[in-house]
Amino acid sequence: MSSSMCLARCSASLSAGNFPSRMFMGRLHAQRRTRTLQLRCAASLLPDQPTLAASSAISPVPSDLPEVLGDALHRLGAIYVLADASASTAAAAVMPTAVDSAAGAAPQRAGGWVAPVADALEQVLYALQEGLDKLHVPYSYGYSIILLTLIVKLLTYPLTKQQVESAMAVQALKPRIDLIKDRFGEDKDKIQKETSVLYEQAGVNPLAGCLPTLATIPIFIGLFSSLTNVANDGLLDTQGFYFVPSLAGPTTMAMRQSGLGTSWLWPLGPDGAPPIGWEDAAAYLTLPLLLVAVQYASSSVTSPPIDPKDENANTQRALLVFLPLMVGWFSLNVPAGLSLYYLANTVLSSAIQIYLKKLGGANVVMNELGPVTKPGSGRRNGVAAGEWSVWKPATVLTTAEAAKARAEAEEAVERAREAAEEAAAAAAFDNASVSLSVDDSTAAIAGTATMAVTAGAPAAAMDPSKVNRRCKRRRLTSLVQDGSTASAAVAGASA
């Protein structure tokens, strides 16, 4: 159906007192926007015609249309000025094939398995918008997008909670995993085996956190597709949101798919202004900038601390820096309604993560482990390799208890390291020997005995916190006895 036929049908319906349906008006808006884009792109490629520029003037409304339809088209004119500016400016900077592709790309609705989910969420969005309109809430479409995002987050909250609890359980075992890595060094097979045994004994599945995330992906794809359908149908063309002129601007999904999603922002004109002017550009840039700031704040609050010794530490830091920038760049290429959804989703996700991780909302279910023993030391006293000495029944740990368990595990790791230093000190004592050589010279014998008696001085000067007291006392007593024996030998030799 052509645009003129659509206008004639609307005129006849309005004259008869029948208002066109929301879906029909959406198709009308989408067809008119596509036709405007085609005409402007074609005109900009004519060699004898100057490049079209954005104008604040609104095209005159045909006088034979009813007053209601004329007012609607008048309010729709602003968004088409944005489309005109984007198309005319981009046409001078890109190849003709790209312009033809952008002009001929008609809005398409989601298909395949996404279609039922997108259609259902779209109907919920319509119901929310109509309900807000009845309550005379301003910016009803913007608030309906936020409410729909909130509903989806609440529906997926159990899956999010399960994912967070699994991640916290794995994080609580990290000190013990680090001890395993220190014990086996570069033997990755042994590390993997011991780590698997630890997960099994602790009752933790490290892959359990992936399943809830995968389950929520189709839902959010459907939500994104439903908002895309609304934008393609033109239902957001006249819907602003506070400082944002239109939730359908400043670009379209068709232009984004053709690589012209940011043509509203650059290239800059001769006066240094973007194609749509600094005033509108600044208004549309507010949402992407807010989104980047919220992403950075969320990452700094909810992300676990990065271990400098981790081999993936640099990759994790790079993701924390570049991921918000990538999301901000993507929001520049989509209508403002989708940017509003990204912002609402980020804020709600951050609030849920803070509640679960910082405020005790998550319960970590795992077997409480006893003191740390040497993993991988083989079977000793009935304890197999990789097992830990004390086991308790499965308990439910709150966030505070999980933090306490993590601190106790770190203390156990420190005690194990001190035990390793103690073992090294004991080995040093074992290597020390008292050697006596009876020579013809009495002075040489006396000097050898003196060296033997003073052989324990460095060991006695060691830090008491690093050497077990009982081991130290036993070793020093042995040295004193050896020294006494050496002195007696010297006295006998002298006699």
Swiss-Prot record:
Compartments in which it is found: Plastid, Chloroplast thylakoid membrane
Assembly and oligomerization: Associates with the LHCII complex and with the psaE subunit of the LHCI complex.
Major site of localization recorded for this protein: plastid
Listed Pfam families: 60KD_IMP
NCBIfam families, sorted: yidC_oxa1_cterm
Keywords, in A-Z order: Chloroplast, Membrane, Plastid, Thylakoid, Transit peptide, Transmembrane, Transmembrane helix
Transmembrane segments: 76-96, 207-227, 274-294, 318-338, 442-462
Entry keyword Plastid: yes
Membrane topology: Multi-pass membrane protein
Spans within the Lumenal topological domain: 228-273, 339-441
Lineage top rank: taxon: Eukaryota
Segments on the Stromal side according to the record's topology features: 97-206, 295-317, 463-495
Stated name of the protein: Inner membrane ALBINO3-like protein 1, chloroplastic
Family of the protein in this entry: Belongs to the OXA1/ALB3/YidC (TC 2.A.9.2) family.
GO cellular component: chloroplast thylakoid membrane
